[in-house]
């Protein structure tokens, strides 16, 4: 795994999280369909496809984000979620 690539993807995940929270500020960032927002933004407004050297199918990325959220929540790692997700996305898509 390329640690630099994972770090850059973690930055993108943090960025989309901040954007999502601003867009959904009226609900304090709560959005049951957050993963669709994230995947759409990551694929259309970020360098994610270039960093992965491929463009994931949006619905697959959405599913992966939901699964990562479930795994992260249940395992409770000490690593911040953006870095944890990024490592796994790089493993899957590169």
What positions do the PLM features span?
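Eukaryotic low-complexity, intrinsically disordered regulatory segments enriched in serine, proline
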Residues: 1-94
């Amino acid at each position: 795994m390329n640690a630099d690539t994972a770090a850059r993807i973690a930055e993108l995940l943090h960025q989309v999280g901040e954007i999502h929270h601003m867009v959904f500020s009226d609900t304090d960032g709560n959005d049951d369909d957050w993963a669709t927002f994230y995947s759409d933004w990551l694929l259309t407004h970020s360098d994610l496809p270039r960093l992965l050297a491929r463009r994931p199918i949006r619905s697959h990325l959405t599913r992966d984000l939901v699964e990562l959220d479930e795994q992260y929540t249940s395992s409770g790692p000490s690593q911040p979620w953006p870095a944890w997700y990024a490592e796994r996305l790089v493993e899957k898509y590169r």
